[in-house]
A protein has these predicted regions:
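Conserved NTP-binding catalytic cores of kinases and kinase-like/nucleotidyltransferase enzymes
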Residues: 1-2, 110, 124-129, 243-251
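ATP-binding pocket architecture of kinase catalytic cores
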Residues: 1-61, 65-67, 71, 78-81
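Hydrophobic packing residues in well-ordered alpha-helices of helical domains and bundles
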Residues: 30, 34-37, 65, 90-93, ...
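Secondary-structure capping and boundary motifs in well-ordered enzyme cores
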Residues: 33, 64, 108, 113, ...
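Active-site acidic catalytic loop and adjacent metal/ATP-binding pocket
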Residues: 44-45, 98-145, 155-156
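An alpha-helical support segment within catalytic cores of ATP-dependent transferases
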Residues: 49-58, 63-64, 68-111, 179-181
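Active-site activation/catalytic loop segments of kinase-like enzymes and analogous catalytic loops
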Residues: 70-80, 141-177, 189-209, 221-228
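ATP/Mg2+ or Mg2+-diphosphate-binding catalytic cores
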Residues: 200-251
Length: 251
């Protein structure tokens, strides 16, 4: 026998609570809300593998990350922005995509929600609950932290997003030096990859799927790709030139 326990958590998303507080100038109240969500992230790291669990049969490996970067190239840069890379640029993009993807996949053995952002966290009686976790899988330890702190739905200033990430790292690592180093070494590259994938998704949902104006989130996503944060000499074309091309398409 099996039982399914269902609880109605209402219709108040973390997004609306956070935006409401920011609109009233209550930045610290919003930051505290995110601090509480870090408790959930920390719990994610305690999820034990089970070979029968669906999430254990999926993983963010190098091939998947490369596929997502190519998805961005096709569904946004080419299909929305109308920008086609030259042959040499395409080769550089491919080479750097492999390097970036290999780096992220080298430490990709943690439970990740995959869509952990302010629209998938519900708020009821000051308590938080996670929804939409059917795409969970193995992935980089920084994936969900970056997803939450840099989602395009909340109008944080970039300095506040960085503050959130640093607070999240401290809470999640909780004195674990190795875990803290992994998070600090990885989150910028993770931000770059994930936001390019998100921009690709905005193009895909708006143009191919006609699901509404998701293109309005491209600029907020672009603003999170601050050069002082994401530029990396290991993949300079992707972390600089590609971002410049996105910027020209949004003017």
């Amino acid at each position: 026998y099996a039982a399914i326990i269902i609880q109605d958590y209402g219709n108040i998303m973390m997004e609306s609570v956070a935006i409401g507080a920011l609109d009233q100038g209550k930045l610290e109240e919003t930051m505290d809300l995110y601090q509480r969500s870090f408790v959930i992230l920390k719990k994610f790291l305690t999820v034990k593998p089970d070979r029968e669990a669906p999430w254990c049969k999926r993983k963010f490996d190098s091939e998947r990350f490369q596929w997502e970067l190519n998805f961005f190239l096709k569904e946004y840069l080419e299909n929305v922005a109308g920008i086609v890379l030259s042959e040499s640029e395409a080769l550089t993009f491919k080479k750097e995509s492999v390097a970036l993807s290999n780096f992220l996949a080298s430490n990709s053995d943690h439970f990740v929600h995959r869509d952990f952002h302010s629209r998938n966290v519900m708020v009821k009686n000051e308590k938080l609950a996670v929804i939409d976790f059917q795409d969970a899988r193995y992935g980089p330890v920084s994936y969900d932290l970056v997803s939450l702190c840099f989602d395009s739905y909340i109008p944080f200033e970039i300095k506040d997003r960085v503050t959130l990430v640093n607070r999240g790292i401290e809470h999640i690592s909780n004195g674990n030096t190795g875990l803290k180093e992994d998070l600090e070494n990885q989150w910028r590259a993770m931000l770059l990859q994930r936001q390019l994938k998100a921009i690709g998704s905005f193009g895909y949902l708006s143009v191919r799927k006609n699901r509404g104006n998701y293109l309005k989130y491209v600029k907020p996503a672009l603003e999170t790709l601050d050069p002082s944060i994401v530029f990396d000499e290991r993949w300079p074309f992707i972390s600089s030139k590609i971002i410049e091309l996105i910027a020209t398409s949004t003017k």
